[in-house]
Amino acid sequence: MLSIIGIAVDNKFRKEWSNMSRALIIGAGGVAGVVIHKCCQNSEVFTDICIASRTKSKCDKFKEELQDKTKTNITTAQVNADNVPELVALMKEYKPDICINVALPYQDLHIMDACLECKVDYVDTANYEPEDTAKFEYKWQWAYRERFEKAGITALLGSGFDPGVTGVFCAYAQKHYFDEINYIDILDCNGGDHGYPFATNFNPEINIREVSAKGSYIQDGKWVETEPMEIKRVYNFDQVGEKDMYLLHHEELESLALNIKGIKRIRFFMTFGQSYLTHLKCLEDVGMTSIEPIDFEGKKIVPLQFLKAVLPDPASLGPRTKGKTNIGCIFQGKKDGKDKTYYVYNVCDHQECYKEVGSQAISYTTGVPAMIGAMMILTGKWKKPGVHNIEEFDPDPFMDALNKWGLPWKENFDPVLVD
């Protein structure tokens, strides 16, 4: 065991790694668990991984579970992702080729700073969000473009499902089926049931901040803002059925509006059941979704962070959750002067995900693309210095990898459109 600046690193599996790939995975939650499992399944690319988190025992648990089942060498470390010197010390000791950030969005910039100092490629699944402001956008990370270019390293932003696969779907549609895409509707449906009166399928703090914020969409190059849950539609999803869905603000709209030719409107919809919305409204009404600190028994606490502590851990939902997810994009545009529509989507089964990696499908659909994005960079298919959104790269190898690694996609050339 080696200790550096308060960082405990299990060094048992340290080895010379010429012509091998070394990945540092920061985070130990539900999505991180999927990334770790999929990297270990893909040992030809991920020959060595280091799992690092504030709580090293969580990392050690993954190592104990997987080390005898994989050819990937697994190391664990304790690190505070809010502390750039700690991150730098860990990277200098472990010497990763790439850092897969599946920690909190608040920590993106700290991790990017460490990657810059150590010249390590970077992948994340969600854009930066200031902890004290429920507002997420790409401007903070896009500001790193020139520095990453000069350092000769690649930052791949948003390599989850949405953002992530949805951007790849857009690039694929643009490359193969359209001369210009005028309308995109991103539909995120979770038809799963975990049996709890109220729980979130990913980090409760991030999830509740997202769905309680004002909605927005892009129309003719401008943001149009709506009240939370103001715009509702009903859609019949393949293998899930008819669901209520609501327009939300979502980060990929910002980059897709810049990178997809001919865009007139982009919207994002997510399904919610009535029980979830009723509970959320009650929590909002009593102040439990607030991010403003309050005084409690002589201490400052953030109500939403307290709520997160009492809600079920999303990583614990796997064995309870039944049903399927359906996430995809509906496109309208032009090809050879004619109107064209196209729908590409993935259906994922919660129970099948749990059988494979011990996770529900929400974490699975985020973690698999994070591994694939890292693989694209490590194998040179997407290696390009700078800070890039996922739709800026050739979608074909990523689309092939989705089929191989557990997220097969389907196409419909005559879909029902969203009004």
Annotate each language-model stretch with its function.
Residues 70-82:
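Rossmann-fold cofactor-recognition segment
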Residues 127-153:
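Rossmann-fold NAD(P)-binding glycine/threonine-rich loop
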Residues 55-57:
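Helix N-cap at the beta1-alpha1 junction of Rossmann-like dinucleotide-binding domains, i.e.
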